[in-house]
C-alpha cells in the first residue's frame, strides 16, 4: 500500500491546497508514535481486518482521536475485526466494512452532487470500481454525512457467498 500512499501524498502536495501530506517510512504503525502528534488528519491505507495496523494500537490511536485529529481510511483499511476494533471504528468514523455483511463488487454507480461543501465544483460522475456497500454504520447514521451514494445493480447480488463477495443479509436488504 506504500505506493498508493505515495501517490496520494504527491497529489495532495501538488494540489495547491494548504496541506502537507507526509508518508511515514515505517511499515505498519509508526515506531516513533510522536510523528503523529502534529498531524491534523491521519490517512490509513493498509491491509484490513485481522491484518489492520490499528488492531494492536487501539488505545494509542483512540487517544489521538480524542484529541480531535481527523482520520481517513481507504479501501481495505475500512475493514474491522468484530469487538473492540469494530466498536472503535464506529466511534471514530461512524461505520466500517464488516466482512460477511458488507460487500465490495465492481460496479458503476452514478454519483450526483449533494448539498455539502465537499461537492463544490464537482459535477456528477461515475467510475467502474470496487465500491463497497452494505456497510455497518452507527444507529440512525448519527454524525455521519453521506457524500457518495447510489443503489447498486441487482447483478452485484449474484456472486457466491464469501467474506467480501455476497451473503444472505445483503441479498435480503
Please place each PLM-identified region on the residue numbering.
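Short, functional N-terminal and low-complexity linear motifs
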Residues: 28-30, 85, 173
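A glycine-rich, often tryptophan-bearing local segment used as a flexible ligand/cofactor-contacting loop or short
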Residues: 51-124
